[in-house]
């Protein structure tokens, strides 16, 4: 037995898996031929790689034992490891960026095109039905759609003012058509605008149409704008997170993971999977967006469902012409009552001379009536897209990326360059210091849990990551508020429209299942000057001048001209019965 002892010691010395320490590979693998072959294929100069192992006292990251790497080679391998890791992360996230960018583009194009379709349909139908009379006043309708686009595309402010200005301008154009026998100077029109802006809402020339239009269009625009902004924010945050520079601690851990086996002369020895997962979790802790990511996706889906349900953008775009027509019909049907109150408050204007009165429209034009065609199918854009299809696609795409950040370390370590395959989990692997089994526990989870990661220090504050998460939280909060009909960028988004009156929302404002909303009280809007082409605006004192000496004759004045008003209604009908 004693004679066999030297032979047993020699065999123990030569066995790679049973060596006395981590440096056993150096005693077995004396040649750097395999390392030279691998690095030569990568374009490394073979002059920098010794043919056999040398002392590793100069190494800064890898174990300072026998090595095939010079200092320069080690630094190049550190850079290569970083490039490999960043490439894997960016490639893994390219689908996510493409998904958010494509959804943003499709929804944005759809909403913009729906506004254009609504404007074109209204102009086409009104122009066909009323010809010259609509053309003369088309500017106020074009201004309305310009204001809606500005809200959606640009500042996100002034939606209330846009709608209120539209109804005020429409009244300034429509009211004189009811009374062509009078001349209406700017002071009278200023008084008219003030009267429709009073807090009590006593004069509602267009009935409840302004309020209903505002409720429908504002909630749809707020939701559409928040959804598109949310998709854009998500795309930008993800793109930034995937391109974050690798920190020094991560660079060194990556070098120990995939670079040091080359320096030890064992490039075929794959890193242990647990080792790779710890390095990946630690490096990606400054990129991951959990748990904000899940809430962000929920906000997108919630808002998308609202947009094809109670806050339907399609329905809102279609209803613009309908609500305007209903408002004009109300003004026509209640013209006597509205005129009496206006003349009582603002006085009776001067009559015009007979030769300058407007001639009535031809009887055949005045007798026209326009009826909305029944809705046959969901509106589509020129590309054949409708909102239902877009929402379905969004839901399907987001289901694929919900666990992206939590699963990114596993995805990275699934690459053959980063770790051993799962089928080789029981085989010896590279532990960071030598051949063996990786015994440290794999640390997953949040930033706080990564403080216990054995491979790199994650305790330093990460301001950029916190900022990105705050961006996601802000986008999520904006989308959830929009799903409730609130615009966080415009504090008065739920207030009632000017001159439209108050009260509960009507049952036909939304599709079935929508919850009625009681609008909060709104302070009176400051009066706006009339917006008539070519007319200046003087002070409000002119209204009082019209009141002086006229109120006592009001009854006879209104009574005298009422038959004339009724006779002239066919002329006004050509503008007022718009749809």
Curated annotation (Swiss-Prot):
Subcellular location field: Cell membrane
Glycosylated residue positions: 55, 92, 155, 498, 500
Subunit note: Interacts (via heparan sulfate) with PTN; this interaction promotes neurite outgrowth through binding of PTN with chondroitin sulfate of proteoglycans, thereby releasing PTPRS of chondroitin sulfate proteoglycans (CSPGs) and leading to binding with heparan sulfate of GPC2. Interacts (heparan sulfate chain) with MDK; this interaction is inhibited by heparin followed by chondroitin sulfate E; this interaction induces GPC2 clustering through heparan sulfate chain; this interaction induces neuronal cell adhesion and neurite outgrowth.
Identification of the protein by name: Glypican-2
InterPro entries, alphabetized: Glypican, Glypican_CS
Annotated Gene Ontology cellular component terms: endoplasmic reticulum; extracellular region; Golgi lumen; plasma membrane; side of membrane
Compositionally biased intervals (Pro residues): 517-527
Stated family: Belongs to the glypican family.
